[in-house]
Amino acid sequence: MKEKEMIFGIRAVIEAVEAGKDIDKILVKRGLSGELFSELLELTRMHEIPMQNVPVERIDRVTRKNHQGVVAFTSAVTYQKLEQIVPLLYEEGKNPFILVLDGLTDVRNFGAIARTCEVAGVDAIVIPARGSVSVNADAMKTSAGALHSIPVCRERSLKEAIVFLRNSGIKVVTATEKAAELYTGTDMTVPVALLMGAEDTGVASEHLRLSDELVKIPQFGAIQSLNVSVAAGVLIYEVIRQRGELFP
């Protein structure tokens, strides 16, 4: 198990990125500039590492050490690359089953979803590098260790990831209340990627347009939506049901 740690100081952070250390995110003091900052900015873009510009007071709350306006948080897991995972699944003779999460920010929901994915045999989870959850202590705890077992792919562009999946012969099925078709009405015996959004914002419009099919889970009560981890569980086990994998 990897321990999550913090790295302080702009030179130390640059060296960590260059050394290939798995960085979850970097906080940078608002208004920071200079040659070293430009170098760090270029590295974060190259390695697809989320960077946030924040007031210096926020960094001061993290540490009293000489941080020079920069602190990096290492990841508790090693992120995988989708373009490496998918070919490997085909090489192993698997029928790819991937979950894509668009804009999910609740780490406990993420952990619960990861736990379901691991138990159900989902091959990988895809999240965007920015505007999404990170694998922190709460996510690890809620996942009950699942995040150590299932590959997590952090992608710079979710749009490009969806296009890659489709070009790889994987059907992208998106859960949205805007759908006309029920989730039981689409064929998920083929290679499939389930795309789900956050409870409040749903899936981005551009990602909806890229999807092969839109599906919904029927609702009969007054509450407008299911918890996203519950909805993910429903759809994941529908894939298993259709594939005849309920009784291994």
Where are these regions (language model features)?
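Short, acidic/turn-prone active-site loops that include or flank metal/cofactor-
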Residues: G31-L32, V56-E57, R130-S132, E199-T201, ...
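Active-site helix-initiating loop/hinge in glycosyltransferases
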Residues: G9, D102, N109, S225-N227
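N-terminal positively charged helical leader segments and presequences
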Residues: M1-L88
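RNA substrate-binding interface of SAM-dependent RNA methyltransferases
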Residues: E15-K21, S33, I49, P87-E181
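Active-site/ligand-binding-proximal alpha/beta "capping" segment
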Residues: V173-N227
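Glycine- and other small-residue-rich loops at beta-strand/loop junctions that grip anionic moieties
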Residues: E5, K29, D102-G103, P128, ...
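Structured adenosyl-cofactor binding patch, chiefly the S-adenosyl-L-methionine
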Residues: I14, A19-G20, K141-A146, S205-P248
